[in-house]
Regions:
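Conserved alpha-helical positions within TPR/SEL1-like repeat arrays
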Residues: 63-74, 86, 97-108, 119-120, ...
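Conserved structural position within tetratricopeptide repeats
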Residues: 87-90, 121-124, 154-158, 188-192, ...
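Terminal, low-structured helical/coil segments at or just beyond the last alpha-helical repeat
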Residues: 2-4, 8-9, 29-36, 40, ...
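TPR-adjacent "capping" and linker segments in tetratricopeptide-repeat scaffold/adaptor proteins
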Residues: 47-64
Length: 261
């Protein structure tokens, strides 16, 4: 099993509740009070009225919808996430990033045809987004189109050499092609970036394992587990799932070494 990695605030309502005093028109002192306070009341009304009538901007609305969509995707509610991203795109059809976001949710839900369509549309709108190339490469790898995947990972890294996810995913793909030495180079570079270390150590350990260097594999598996024990460790798919995968790989490696019963 290979674990590839894919890459708003609600506006506060301003309610101005204004109260006006009823002034007597029969008593002269009351008239003097009215003349003295009327200008101040008008100044308050003028200052408050624009705030009370201020509508939410299109940008604020998109930000709020996008935040809701991302939260829905994180909890696995793909239908809601897709519906929200679609709503954003209906209002802003030139948003390449939201085509990429919706494409990723389609990919996660298994709708590959719509996923690749959204990735292609995102790149047609903006060919400089390295995250789209990384996501489209993951699509190609899942389809067994490894050459296309490698080319897209290369494109992502040409645009952004610090895209650790692209280095990680390219290493996994090269390993699947049994190009273990080149895969290790990708993982080594990813580790220099200092992010997603637990995941990178796990995948590098798996590469050593499959290449026959069991000592190096065990060392990297242990390093990955140690990184998962650190606070605020961010790993694609969650720390628990990654730890389980590492334990499966370790058991697979150690099984031939156990004495027969």
């Amino acid at each position: 099993m290979n674990m590839r990695s894919s890459t708003g605030r609600q506006p506060k309502a301003n309610n101005a509740d204004r109260s006006r005093n009823s002034l007597s028109t029969t008593a002269r002192p009351a008239l003097r009070v009215q003349k003295r306070w009327q200008p101040k009341a008008r100044r308050v009304d003028t200052a408050i009225a624009p705030r009370a009538a201020s509508p939410i901007s299109q940008t604020e609305l998109e930000t709020a919808l996008r935040q809701e969509a991302l939260q829905a995707a994180q909890r696995g509610d793909h239908n809601e996430a897709i519906a929200l991203f679609t709503l954003i795109l209906e209002q802003n059809p030139s948003s390449a990033r939201d085509y990429n976001n919706r494409g990723l949710v389609y990919f996660q839900s298994g709708d590959m045809e719509r996923a690749i369509a959204d990735y292609n549309q995102a790149l047609a709108l903006d060919s400089t987004l390295d995250s789209v190339y990384n996501n489209r490469a993951n699509y190609y790898a899942a389809q067994g189109k490894f050459l296309e995947a490698i080319l897209d990972y290369d494109a992502a890294l040409d645009l952004n050499p610090t895209n650790v996810r692209a280095w990680l995913n390219q290493g996994i793909t090269l390993r699947e092609l049994e190009m273990h030495d080149r895969a290790l180079e990708c993982f080594d570079f990813a580790l220099r970036l200092g992010r997603l270390e637990a995941h990178v150590y796990a995948e590098r350990g798996r590469t050593h394992h499959l290449w026959g260097d069991w000592n190096a594999a065990l060392t990297d598996y242990q390093r990955a587990i140690e990184r998962l024990s650190l606070p605020n460790t961010a790993t694609p798919g969650g720390a628990a799932r990654l730890r389980l995968q590492i334990e499966v790989w370790k058991d697979e490696l150690l099984a031939p070494l156990e004495p027969a019963q």
